[in-house]
Amino acid sequence: MWGSRAQQSGPDRGRTCLLAVLLLSFSLFQLHAQDYKPSQTPPPTSDALLKPMGRVQKEICGKTKFQGKIYGGSIAKAERWPWQASLIFRGRHICGAVLIDKNWVASAAHCFKRSLKPSDYRILLGYNELSNPSNYSRQMTLSKVIVHEDYNKLHSQEKDIVLIQLHLPVRYSSHIFPVCVPDQTTKEPSDESCWISGWGMVTDDKFLQAPFPLLDSEVFLMNDQECEAFFQTPQISITEYDAIKDDMICAGDITNQKSTCRGDSGGPLVCLLDSYWYLVGLASWSGACLEPIHSPSIFTRVSHFSDWIEKKKADTPDVDPSLAPLEETAPSLIGWRNYSAGTTLEPRICTTLLSSQVLLLQSIWLRIL
């Protein structure tokens, strides 16, 4: 993440710079300052039947210690995002992930390009700073890795989702708690802000520094047509180009330079719906993670996969606890190394033209005000 933002990468596509600039200038995101208020009690941990939106939930989900709206961004407060997970590959953070119930975690399929062997990975839960585990922090071993069978088959980054079954169920606390999973009837907010979080890079050439704090950012959802303008080529009209598929959703805040970056892949895009936090997206790809930010980030639209998620969970046998490895000590990450190319996909960006046009138009706009 850069400052108060998280940023990710994107596929090898061009874009129409002038149109992107015009959209940036005349479609500035409305900002919402939000207050948070710590509650007196941690989120409930007992099982219950809820119906926050659409499908009945088997467990309580989407509640945090922070009730009401949230202000600002940058370094996230402990317990703010208790579903945030880190995907570790051979001892190194490579991607974000999200706890969706006591046995399952979701992430981006492209995070598993290195290996599909569960024993190569670990899931970290209950962390705020990756180098400073707390008494709530847990390192979980993986039983199964289920990549969507149609990932990348027809289009780049399409169906970029993976389900991860844990060997042992997690114990819920105010630091470890699942987010709600939307179904296809869940309506995404059109006029409210959402949030992204992760331990990714600050920029493409700047690593997050120790103690590796979790960063978060307020972002806004963008309709597909507006988003398409940032990723089309000059030779193809907006009606012919189709970078944003039905299983993708756009979000960002270009005005305030908030996006996703390397190492944020698979992390959450969450929105507050009827007082519950929902996993609207999983970080998938975006433009280059450099200043100034030229384009929104693209996320896997989780509601598109709600039936797939339920089916895979139902079809997968529970792990026999007697056969599971012993729970491991939560580690303290002490080094930060380059991410493999698998965690980021960067499109070609007409940086010079776009940067100069943005600065010019923003200057004119400020003078008019």
UniProtKB/Swiss-Prot annotation:
GO terms for molecular function: serine-type endopeptidase activity. Its EC number is 3.4.21.-. Residues 70-314 form the Peptidase S1 domain. Residues 1-33 form the signal peptide. It holds the Pfam family Trypsin. Keywords: Cytoplasmic vesicle, Disulfide bond, Hydrolase, Protease, Secreted, Serine protease, Signal. The keyword Disulfide bond applies. One of its GO terms (biological process) is proteolysis. It is found in: Cytoplasmic vesicle, Secretory vesicle, Acrosome; Secreted. The active site is at H110 (charge relay system), D160 (charge relay system), S265 (charge relay system). Its main location: cytoplasm. One of its GO terms (cellular component) is extracellular space. Disulfide bonds join C95-C111, C194-C271, C227-C250, C261-C289. May play an important role in the sperm/egg interaction; released during the acrosome reaction. Belongs to the peptidase S1 family. There appears to be no human ortholog of this protein. This is Serine protease 40. It comes from Rattus norvegicus. The lineage of its organism: Eukaryota, Metazoa, Chordata, Craniata, Vertebrata. The gene is Prss40.
